[in-house]
């Protein structure tokens, strides 16, 4: 039977760990609420610009932007959004597994793949396995700024503009609710043509002033930026939700483990007392 002193030490250690996990759970709840508010605040802009782009894909444009053109696929790029910190359950692992499966399908067709990475977890993982990384950024924090993301967005857009990439995907976690976060891979370039059936009966053309090419260049760049930013904010909400659930599970596991150890401790203490009584009785009998 384990020594009572050792068991007591383990119980104290688990109690201290429980305090930490409980505190982290409460912090995650607070951060998740703030991130959800930020996500909802940025959603109207993302939805409106998305709707405008959908109309543009159906319009008779004076200038047909390259972002609407499908071309033969030789190279594709992924913008991968992960977390900077751990203790978020299987959030990053599930995302990376889905991405690796998708990359494998392209590799089997002889397609070259290049990555732009957001977050320490993606940077560490994909550099470790030897993936071709052409841009990366870390330290997004809990209050993401578009200025922090502009660099990798420009790198990928320039690669697409120069026909170095033929498709561009955005990889992130979709926040469904507190207990559900779904990894998703969305094509952002060329602009997908699905889900536009409902607009066909009510679309319109725009009048461009002063120049359609200039306006479309700016508008489509803003669209890509909004897509990436919205995904980063949504991924942060997913991170905090996953961390909250993970820390809650850790706290509950600590409670269960402490109960089990207390039972073991009481048995060990009881055996120790019984042994001492037996020794006293044996000593008294000898006298």
Curated annotation (Swiss-Prot):
Species this chain originates from: Baumannia cicadellinicola subsp. Homalodisca coagulata
Protein family membership: Belongs to the ATPase gamma chain family.
Subunit architecture: F-type ATPases have 2 components, CF(1) - the catalytic core - and CF(0) - the membrane proton channel. CF(1) has five subunits: alpha(3), beta(3), gamma(1), delta(1), epsilon(1). CF(0) has three main subunits: a, b and c.
Subcellular location: Cell inner membrane
Gene Ontology biological process terms in this record: proton motive force-driven plasma membrane ATP synthesis
Membrane topology field: Peripheral membrane protein
Gene of this entry: atpG
GO molecular function: ATP binding; proton-transporting ATP synthase activity, rotational mechanism
Keyword tags: ATP synthesis, Cell inner membrane, Cell membrane, CF(1), Hydrogen ion transport, Ion transport, Membrane, Transport
Protein task: Produces ATP from ADP in the presence of a proton gradient across the membrane. The gamma chain is believed to be important in regulating ATPase activity and the flow of protons through the CF(0) complex.
Lineage start: Bacteria, Pseudomonadati, Pseudomonadota, Gammaproteobacteria, Candidatus Palibaumannia
Main location class: membrane
GO cellular component, one term: plasma membrane
Record PANTHER family: ATP SYNTHASE GAMMA CHAIN (PTHR11693), ATP SYNTHASE SUBUNIT GAMMA, MITOCHONDRIAL (PTHR11693:SF22)
Listed name of the protein: ATP synthase gamma chain
Span of the signal peptide: none
